[in-house]
Amino acid sequence: MTTGRRYTGGTIAFAVFMLLAARVADAQQSVSDVLSFLVTNRSIPTGDFVRDEQAAIATRDTISKLLVLELATLPSSSGGGFTYRLDPALGTVIRASDSFGPLFTERSLLAGRGRASFGMSFSSVSYDNIDGRSLRDGTLVSTASIFRGDTAPFDVETITLKFRTDTVTLNGTVGITDQLDISAGIPFIRLNLEGERVDNYRGQQLVQASGSASTAGLGDIVVRARYNMYRAGASGMAVGAEVRLPTGNEEDLLGTGSTSFTPRFIGSYEQDRVGIHGEVGYTLRGVSEALTYAGAVTAVAAPRLTLVGELLGRRLNAVGRLVETTLPHPRLAGVDTVRLTSSDETADRLLVVAGFKWNIASTWLLTANVLRPLTDVGLNARWVPSVTFDYWFD
């Protein structure tokens, strides 16, 4: 048993070290500096520098905000894989449910007094679109000039951006009482950015700028608490709260720079092998205030295996969305200028999740899942896989 613990600790230390070692020597500028260089230095003469600058800054700020928002709101594992209760008839502690619970949606059952867990999750994400616009194929137009009545511009500047994140999150849960538990998540993030800006004038392409940056470090730490108000077998109701602390580097887009608080209500119903779970909450402060909601269906496929499907949603208030504006050129008759900028508006973001929880041995729990966006709001990847290992202490 001692050897196993040493191996686990070494594995965790190695994974975190590899992330923190990612700051390369040639990326002395911050990620936000490189992003600003790629987005704001537009070269097409439009005759209106002020509007050009305003649109470029708004675009840069929106892309930065959406990246930080994605890192800050990427779902983290729910607590309570193993749940326990005292059986008065037997006078001993037994499993409160045969199910290992949802993936990201919280459930009302708690860990139990004196119970604790420690785990590590890993996720690697390559983002390929933002607000429905491709980031990687060179079709993201920053500025363009077009003759009125034509279908294609004669001078167009496009941006290509490749964002990739690798995240290792250390998770822990402690049961304070049978009705109260506390958990925390500590993310370590490696962020890579590569991009270029290309001008296409009447079919002649010229690379205007290119750049890359890489950084790694601590993200925003999450602390949660759940309190069980009512329990009937494996069903019940609970209230919870989540605090995200601004521990990530804001300049390198690893953190939000502000504390957010999310109170939530949690409900669960379990009957035989099937469970239905739901939660609703509201995020205050942070990158954007948001109504959050989630629902999950769990099925005990075998004594050691739980299958899970979930729907996760957020209604974001005044989040920036990329839009194109078209205005007449102030000096050239019959020519319009197209600019990429942003507009603050309320937007809905939905994710569907499928995965499983497998009790591989003793109280070791392996969780594997994949997320798929159902809307084009914000920064998106086609698929977001993640794997988590948890150990529950007896």
Q: What would you call each of these model-derived segments?
A:
Residues 28-183, 187-219, 323-335:
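A subset of solvent-exposed loop/turn segments in beta-rich extracellular surface proteins, enriched
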Residues 100, 106-107, 118-120, 170-176, ...:
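Residues on the lipid-exposed face of transmembrane beta-strands in outer-membrane beta-barrel proteins
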Residues 103-105, 154-158, 206-212, 249-253, ...:
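Extracellular loop and loop/strand-boundary signature of outer-membrane beta-barrel proteins
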Residues 122-128, 186-192, 229, 243-249, ...:
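Transmembrane beta-strands of outer-membrane beta-barrel pores
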Residues 130-135, 195-201, 239-242, 249-257, ...:
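Outer-membrane beta-barrel translocator domains and adjoining extracellular loop/strand segments
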